[in-house]
Amino acid sequence: MVTVFDAVSDRAQRVRHPEKAHRPDTEVLRKPDWIRVKAPTSKGYQETRSIVKSHKLVTVCEEAGCPNIGECWDKKHATFMIMGEICTRACAFCNVATGKPNALDLDEPANVAKAVKQMGLSHVVITSVDRDDLDDGGAEHFEKVIFAIREASPETTIEILTPDFLRKPGALERVVAAKPDVINHNLETVPSNYLTVRPGARYFHSIRLLQRVKELDPTMFTKSGIMVGLGEERNEVLQLMDDLRTADVDFLTIGQYLQPSRKHHKVEKFVTPEEFKSYETVAYTKGFLMVSSSPLTRSSHHAGDDFARLKAARERKLAAAE
């Protein structure tokens, strides 16, 4: 995740996506004051970076260009991205490189577990690129990473942010059986945007995936997130909330889409903090246990603190029902 500046960074200007090379440049809008963040320079940031590099790990923080990297890494929080740094999908919003992935690193589960222990993480988030090239979409690798972390750091809670495992029968079941504490799968945007923003995915397949998690394990916490500013209408966001509640999703995150480069989908609108607060208020009335809605909200931002609040919210709900 790179720091957000007014100009597109040199890194963002490099075309990491061959499929986007033919696209015309889109205008990169000047970011409003409420989205400015400082460049990461702290000692904690440098220490986290050193640990990540020493174990030859990939983080979505760097690969996706997250604006919160300075804050998170200063606190020694990081989201590990497993199964390589090359994705088989070509989403119009994403800065992760697209192409033919390398073979899985068989040492990665152990290396992630070592890093988690070295960083002293009480809560860790594990995500991945899409691996449509693998028969199980990478489900077994997720399982191995979860087991390795459990063995090395049994007190650490584990949150996984999964791909959709489209056309990978049995993959989700294997991941749920590995017993992470939270399963997150992001819808990313409203269904009317899928053909242009997330063409390799299917909106209702993602809804069904989240619903299936609860069928397999009703006690599992589920989570999903979207970006706004991609041209969606407010009523579409509210309908998406209803779809997620139909799937009994516990936690919703809503953040501002930020354009990684001129070859990516343009920012149609910078949603104001007041509008984000309104979304949060409505989402709580629809029954979500937890909602995080702000311009800089990201799926794994403050994930550890949010998990503690999520557990407390469920306990209050259960107590009220007695």
Curated annotation (Swiss-Prot):
Source taxon at top rank: Bacteria
Names of the cofactor(s): [4Fe-4S] cluster
Residue ranges constituting the Radical SAM core domain according to the UniProt record: 73-289
Catalytic activity: [[Fe-S] cluster scaffold protein carrying a second [4Fe-4S](2+) cluster] + N(6)-octanoyl-L-lysyl-[protein] + 2 oxidized [2Fe-2S]-[ferredoxin] + 2 S-adenosyl-L-methionine + 4 H(+) = [[Fe-S] cluster scaffold protein] + N(6)-[(R)-dihydrolipoyl]-L-lysyl-[protein] + 4 Fe(3+) + 2 hydrogen sulfide + 2 5'-deoxyadenosine + 2 L-methionine + 2 reduced [2Fe-2S]-[ferredoxin]
UniProt keyword Cell membrane present: no
Listed Pfam families: LIAS_N (PF16881), Radical_SAM (PF04055)
Bound cofactor: record note: Binds 2 [4Fe-4S] clusters per subunit. One cluster is coordinated with 3 cysteines and an exchangeable S-adenosyl-L-methionine.
PROSITE patterns: RADICAL_SAM
Protein location: Cytoplasm
A GO CC annotation given for this chain: cytoplasm
Binding site for [4Fe-4S] cluster 1: 61, 66, 72, 300
Pathway in which this enzyme or protein is active: Protein modification; protein lipoylation via endogenous pathway; protein N(6)-(lipoyl)lysine from octanoyl-[acyl-carrier-protein]: step 2/2
Primary localization class, coarse: cytoplasm
Molecular function, one GO term: lipoate synthase activity
Gene3D superfamilies cross-referenced by the UniProt entry: Aldolase class I
Keywords per UniProt: 4Fe-4S, Cytoplasm, Iron, Iron-sulfur, Metal-binding, S-adenosyl-L-methionine, Transferase
UniProt xrefs under InterPro entries: Aldolase_TIM, Elp3/MiaA/NifB-like_rSAM, LIAS_N, Lipoyl_synth, rSAM
Binding site for [4Fe-4S] cluster 2: 87, 91, 94
EC numbers for this chain: 2.8.1.8
Similarity comment: family membership: Belongs to the radical SAM superfamily. Lipoyl synthase family.
Protein name per its UniProtKB record: Lipoyl synthase
Species of origin: Rhizobium meliloti (strain 1021) (Ensifer meliloti)
Gene: lipA
